[in-house]
């Protein structure tokens, strides 16, 4: 029993309630009729209201945070898609050098360059296009693609302007003209080649970093690379049908090289400015790649624990376990900081954190570059790429003169060549290489097994567990299973060219061009994809830039071999009064050498594949 000075708290039973009585009626009036119960009830209701208001505030905060997170995620997706679109557009313009064979023969007939001088111009462009790629890739990895895009626009504009006025100056002095010396044209095409690599690498690196870990990384890389091949096609058509000379009867003649170069100078300058603002790498994705790469190196044992990856705050905290505030309740000096001092301290810590992240990123990328260069399989891959792309570059650059060698010497001068127009062959090689790049990129995505050597175990296990039943049972094919047959198609094109058939049936040269376009496009699509799969995307610009140097040497070597054979055949009795060569000797031995080169490349790639399989690397 309760004492007289104690409040009686009645027991509540479900039978004490009816439908017409307030739930707190007895408590509000009190058992003895006083208002004490109401006071306690008021405080209790106030607490309930405060709790309810706090819950609403917390819920609103959670909702606002979710909305803000979704907004940021949507903004990043929009940025990623827009950057991809700008990257594809940049590649659609960057490959202007692939239309060199459209106006290369005019350097022979209009400017009276020798075949060696024409090849010197094309080789200078090839070397300047490929040799600086590691430097530009390094800048893309450590900074952003935007400065490279701006540089490409400026250099493109200056290079094509110089080439336009060098062509307009006319024939060489030794041919009775007042034209500028050939080295001026060489300088112009060195600038054009440099700008080509700038714009191409800025666009491809942006796409690789923004989509490098998705399940569609192959097609997202193949599309801009395919756009690079298509640029020569549409630009050659514009030159042939819009920027061409007109004969007296109103028919179309040769391309107006001066106007064509002016058009490219203005167009590519504007494209570089657009890329400056449009090529963006989503920072969150890049930070994720860096962190995952560090974790993978630590798990593999290649990266031992180092004080370099310990933030300075952790090192400083190791000097003392307890703070001064733990010794007593007296406020320490830290508690007396003003708001401005706290803000400065927070800014200093944030700056230190950003500096640590930057140093970590640079150290990791340099470390991965060393690992890449020490990998023997990389060298086999690069050797094969050298042996495949060198003949391909030489064929594309000399396509115009190869067509003329298949034309009978007694053929009417103004009649179309039975082997086809240079613009037609440029279009064929652009279309076939584009189809090959898109097909190999998409099919390799569909059939290639999932990579397990670059992801942390928990991420990859989650991906495997999320796969559906039909996907798990789908047959898998390595990307090398697409690369090797493509190389054999390429060798078949050279083998057909080296046979007597194209001389008897010049129309077969279209088949040769199509086969070479298929093999050449597949190599340029699959090799960067393989590099991103085997060595990751965090250092993709540098890694791909190192391998992308080798076509420069290949193009120079096979270009010199072709021009030497062409000139020897011309001097040996196969030349015509206009300086052009006709017959098998002009190109035959070169075509045989290209066939053998591609076969050796297949062997080198098989050796690289064996090395990856031995290490458990899924390609």
Swiss-Prot record:
Which Gene Ontology molecular-function terms are recorded?
transmembrane transporter activity
Gene Ontology CC: one annotated term: fungal-type vacuole membrane
**Compartments (UniProt record):** Vacuole membrane
Q: Which domain of life is it from?
A: Eukaryota
Q: Is Disulfide bond one of the keywords UniProt gives this record?
A: no
Lipid bilayer topology: Multi-pass membrane protein
Annotated keywords: Membrane, Transmembrane, Transmembrane helix, Transport, Vacuole
User: By its UniProt entry, which Pfam families does this protein fall under?
Assistant: MFS_1
Q: Where, by residue number, does the polypeptide cross the bilayer? A: 88-108, 120-140, 147-167, 184-204, 219-239, 261-281, 377-397, 428-448, 480-500, 515-535, 541-561, 589-609
Q: What does this protein do?
A: Probable transporter.
- Member of which family? Belongs to the major facilitator superfamily.
Quote the PANTHER family the UniProt record gives: TRANSPORTER MCH1-RELATED, UNCHARACTERIZED NODULIN-LIKE PROTEIN
| Stated name of the protein | Probable transporter mch1
The organism named in the record is: Aspergillus fumigatus (strain ATCC MYA-4609 / CBS 101355 / FGSC A1100 / Af293)
Q: Gene name?
A: mch1
């Amino acid at each position: 029993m309760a004492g007289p000075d104690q409040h009686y708290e009645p027991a509540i039973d479900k039978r004490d309630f009816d439908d017409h009585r307030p739930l707190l009626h007895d408590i509000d009036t009190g058992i003895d009729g006083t208002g004490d119960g109401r006071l306690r009830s008021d405080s209790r209701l106030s607490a309930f209201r405060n709790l309810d208001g706090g819950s609403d505030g917390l819920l609103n905060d959670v909702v606002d945070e979710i909305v803000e997170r979704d907004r940021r995620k949507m903004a990043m997706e929009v940025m990623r898609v827009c950057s991809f679109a700008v990257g594809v557009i940049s590649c659609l313009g960057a490959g202007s050098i692939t239309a060199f064979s459209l106006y290369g023969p005019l350097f022979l007939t209009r400017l009276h360059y020798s075949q060696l001088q024409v090849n010197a111009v094309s080789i200078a462009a090839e070397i300047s296009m490929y040799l600086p790629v590691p430097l530009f890739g390094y800048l893309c990895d450590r900074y952003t693609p935007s400065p490279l895009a701006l540089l490409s626009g400026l250099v493109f504009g200056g290079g094509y302007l110089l080439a336009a006025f060098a062509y307009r100056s006319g024939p060489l002095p030794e041919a009775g003209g007042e034209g500028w010396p050939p080295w001026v044209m060489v300088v112009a095409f060195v600038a054009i080649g440099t700008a080509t690599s700038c714009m191409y690498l800025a666009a491809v690196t942006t796409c690789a970093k923004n989509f490098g870990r998705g399940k569609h990384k192959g097609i997202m890389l193949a599309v801009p690379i395919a756009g690079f091949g298509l640029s020569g096609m549409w630009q050659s058509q514009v030159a042939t049908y819009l920027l061409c000379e007109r004969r007296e009867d109103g028919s179309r003649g040769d391309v107006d090289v001066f106007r064509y170069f002016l058009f490219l100078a203005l167009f590519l300058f504007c494209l570089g400015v657009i890329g400056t603002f449009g090529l963006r790498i989503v920072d969150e994705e890049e930070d994720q790649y860096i962190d995952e790469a560090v974790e993978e190196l630590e798990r593999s044992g290649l990266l031992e624990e180092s004080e370099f990856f310990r933030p300075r705050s952790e090192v400083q905290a190791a000097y003392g376990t307890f703070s001064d505030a733990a010794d007593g309740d007296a406020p320490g000096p830290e508690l007396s900081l003003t708001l401005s001092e706290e803000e400065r301290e927070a800014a200093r810590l944030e700056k230190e954190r950003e500096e640590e992240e930057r140093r970590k990123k640079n150290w990791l990328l340099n470390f991965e570059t060393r690992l890449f260069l020490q990998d023997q399989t990389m060298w086999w891959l690069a050797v094969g790429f050298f042996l495949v792309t060198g003949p391909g570059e030489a064929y594309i650059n000399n396509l115009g003169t190869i067509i003329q060698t298949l034309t009978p010497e007694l053929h009417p001068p103004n009649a179309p060549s039975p082997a086809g127009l240079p613009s037609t062959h440029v279009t064929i090689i652009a279309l076939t290489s584009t189809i090959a790049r898109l097909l190999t990129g998409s099919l390799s995505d569909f059939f290639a097994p999932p990579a397990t050597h670059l992801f942390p175990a928990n991420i990859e296990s989650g991906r495997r567990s999320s796969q559906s039943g039909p996907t798990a049972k789908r047959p898998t094919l390595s990307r090398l299973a697409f690369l090797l047959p493509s190389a054999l198609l390429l060798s078949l094109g050279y083998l057909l060219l080296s046979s007597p058939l194209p001389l008897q049936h010049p129309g077969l040269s279209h088949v040769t061009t199509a086969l070479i376009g298929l093999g050449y496009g597949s190599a340029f699509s699959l090799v960067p994809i393989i590099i991103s799969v085997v060595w990751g995307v965090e250092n993709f610009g540098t890694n791909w830039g190192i391998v992308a140097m080798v076509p420069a040497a290949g193009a120079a070597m096979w270009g010199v071999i072709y021009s030497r054979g062409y000139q020897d055949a011309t001097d040996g009795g196969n030349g015509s009064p206009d300086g052009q060569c006709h017959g098998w000797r002009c190109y035959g031995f070169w075509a045989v050498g290209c066939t053998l080169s591609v076969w050796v490349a297949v062997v080198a790639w098989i050796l690289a594949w064996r090395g990856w399989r031995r290490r458990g690397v899924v390609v």
